[in-house]
Amino acid sequence: LEYYQMLRNSGYSDDDIILIMADDLAQNANNPEKGVVRRSVDGDNLYKNVVVDYRLEDITYNDLAVIFSGKPDVAHPEVLDSGAGDNVLFFWSSHGMPAGLALGDIDLVSGKQMARILQKMSDEQRFRKMMWIVEACYSGGVAKECEGIPGLLVMTAANANESSKADLWYAPYNVYLTNRFTSSIISRLYSDPATSLRDLYNVAFTGTLGSHVTIYNADNYGNLYQNTMREFLGK
């Protein structure tokens, strides 16, 4: 939700954003602040004015493939209708395991499956550049399968052999509010939306404890010192 709000604040409308989420926090019976989701104790309500396109429990890998295909149908009215000149920011936060990334409670998406989706997009010239940020345990395994795709850069919270750690325990609610990987990236982007990809990686790497933030496919993307996040956050 923090990325969603950041994009909205950068000038993007809901027509430019596809939001897939579990949507089980704001109105949860155990949430002391009904309708409120925060990343920090005194942070803004990230659920404010949110438009959810798909609930996670309704999404399988096949649904994901349709959404990324750019071809809408009755069941998938909102799709990634991007073209050769578009830069795509893709954020995925979920559980992960060596075999792949969790999609809801029962589906598991492997690295080979994600590579098929993204390679097809590349073959059809449906993005200029894509930045895929993955917050999940063992996320490096999926990213490694996607190497070789032109214009794609993947940054993961952990390599292929380790878990990713939660951060900021809030005792009154008995819950972790965020992940150090994400909080490091978000803080940097708020302070410098035009930060270079190299600097963003360094901030995430040094700010993340318990796992190794890793970049994949840089050789097929471009110069990380010269390329910046302004390409994804500037409308």
Label every PLM stretch briefly.
Residues 1-235:
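Cysteine endopeptidase catalytic domains of the caspase/legumain-like
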